[in-house]
From Swiss-Prot:
Coiled coil: none
Keyword Membrane: no
Protein name: Peptide deformylase 2
Class of this enzyme: hydrolase
Family (UniProt): Belongs to the polypeptide deformylase family.
Keyword Metal-binding: yes
Pfam families linked: Pep_deformylase
CC cofactor note: Binds 1 Fe(2+) ion.
Length: 168
């Protein structure tokens, strides 16, 4: 297992459309690496393969306090949603910036688990929001794409400042 570098905006690899995984057995190491990378962050609850420069349609999420209940979603799709609300979001690929984004508060997601078995998850509240956020990454979308141009500029200024500090 390895901790991978998390890309930050405006890295063009974050905008790449993910490719469907056809052989789940072939991505087990990537799944392990995504989880290890997620667990190395201070406050991350989800990570998508494009955030580490990979094109596979894989998302990992862990909302547990002890970070020991991973949810692995391969080829996930939001098949329905209801009750939109505004809520604050952040992103490991847009460090140090948070903004209100409108999302469904209840969703149905279909995916494969890490063993290739079909999953259908009906969920609400925070998990529903995290799933939508991470699945957006698979389409090359970031949460800041839902913001006004002015707020997008503010977000990118924060990211540039973060990257300068990190480069020291």
């Amino acid at each position: 297992m390895a901790v991978l570098e998390i890309l930050t905006a405006p890295d063009p690899r974050l905008r790449v459309q993910s490719k469907e995984v056809t052989d789940v057995a072939a991505v087990q190491t990537l799944i392990d690496d995504l989880l290890e990378t997620l667990y190395e962050t201070d406050n991350g609850v989800g990570l998508a393969a494009p955030q580490v420069g990979r094109e596979e349609a894989i998302v990992v999420i862990d909302l547990s306090e002890n970070r020991d209940e991973p949810l692995v979603l391969v080829n996930p799709k939001v098949v329905s949603g209801s009750n939109k609300e505004m809520g604050q979001e952040g992103c490991l690929s847009v460090p140090d910036y948070y903004a209100d984004v409108e999302r469904y508060t209840s969703v149905v997601v279909e995916a494969l688990d890490r063993d290739g078995k079909p999953l259908r998850i009906e969920t609400s509240e925070f998990l529903a929001i995290v799933m939508q956020h991470e699945i957006d990454h698979l389409s090359g979308n970031l949460f800041i794409d839902y913001l006004s141009p002015l707020k997008q500029q503010m977000a990118m200024k924060k990211v540039k400042k973060h990257n300068k500090l990190r480069a020291r």
